[in-house]
Every structure is written in structure tokens, then in C-alpha cells.
Amino acid sequence: MIDMHLHSTFSYDGKAEIDDIISQVQKLGIEHFCITDHYEYENGELVHDFNVEEYFLTMEKYDLPKGAEISWDGVGEAVFPDGFDYLLLGIHRYDENLPPDELARDYLERTLFVMERVKFHTLAHLDYPARYAKADFKANRDLIEKILVFLVKNEKALEINTAGLFKHGKPNPDYWIVEMYYDLGGRVVTIGSDAHESQHIGRGIEEVMRELKKFNFEYLAVDGKKLVTVKLR
């Protein structure tokens, strides 16, 4: 089992202590996991960060990989710290006042702009606004295809984020986007619960793994502190 998107109390909104995370992943038999705390820029300003030096020391103490979920809305500049083993790119900003098709298009254009300008390993929760707002992503297949082709050509992974299952009944991205990624040649994915509390670790992952069995995916994971691809049962 795998969970490559977890938040601890290093995140501004995280409620899970490191010891509790370790205890829960061991209890659930999760073999591959990474703590990916928020480091985010909006409107040219650093709005969410954490004490990276302390975080690195803590990860070294527990012999865990160093991860972060980085985010930028494409405004101004964004400078992210070096030294992470794993970087999730998760775009969170969207304009809920736009009509559903325009909301999705604006979000996807922002995502593509940022992807082309920052270093990352995995794109997190594509179609994220669908979790909270009315967003018509099917009306924007052209942009979704551009994003997925970029991932394939640049050997980046697509995350299937299970948190959406508990907000609107579907993972992020929805399965039709995952199928589109596969049809375009994408073969590397990863799965994350996006847990901010220890009791949410691993939530929905077995359900998503069952759905993904129809594809011949490899899963981006960590072995110690090294990024690897694995086959999951």
C-alpha cells in the first residue's frame, strides 16, 4: 500500500504529529509514504511555509524522506527551498465566481503555466476545484491533454488524490482523466490521501487501487529516501 501525500503539524493546517503518522502507517501496513507539507506562493508572496531546517532535522531523526507540496498561482515569482527528496506540485487557487467552464479553463491554464516553470516530481490533484466548486473540466479536454502530454514527455507522475472521494464522491483527478493520461502514454502514477489528520491516512486508497487495476501503471514511491517505481498488488 502507498500514501504519497500526507500533512503533518509542520503544515499550517496539519493536525498530525510525526509520531502519530508513523504509528498509523505501520498499523495500516503502508509500505511507501511521504510527508509533504505546504509551501505556497500567492500574488507574489509566500503565504504558507514551514521551518524547513527543523523539518529536515526531524525527517533525518526518523530516517524519512523529505517531501513538500509546493504551490504557486503563477503571479510574481516563487523560490522553493532545495534539498527535498520529493516534490508534489499542487495548484490550489481558482476563481469560484467564474462560470463552470471558465473556472476550469482558468485553473488549467494556471496549472500548465506553473508546470512549465518549476521543478517537481508529481502533479497533485488535477481538477482540484471540482472538489469544492462547480467546474466543467470535460469542456476543457484540450488543455487537460496538454497538461497530460507535458507529464508524459517530461517523465512526471500523475497523482490520484483520494480526498475527493469524501467531498464529491470522486478522486482528483476523476477516472476519465486518468484513462486519458493512460491513452496518451502515461504509465507512472501515485496515490495520496491528502490526510491532514492521522485518522485520514490511507483513506480511500484501496478503493482507488481497485479501480486502477485495469491499467498497467507503475507507482511512484519512496524506498528509504530514494524515488522508485513499484508495481502494487
Curated annotation (Swiss-Prot):
It is an enzyme of class 3 (hydrolase). GO terms for biological process: L-histidine biosynthetic process. Pathway: Amino-acid biosynthesis; L-histidine biosynthesis; L-histidine from 5-phospho-alpha-D-ribose 1-diphosphate: step 8/9. Keywords: Amino-acid biosynthesis, Histidine biosynthesis, Hydrolase. Coiled coil: none annotated. It catalyses: L-histidinol phosphate + H2O = L-histidinol + phosphate. It comes from the Bacteria. Its EC number is 3.1.3.15. This is Probable histidinol-phosphatase. The lineage of its organism: Bacteria, Thermotogati, Thermotogota, Thermotogae, Thermotogales.
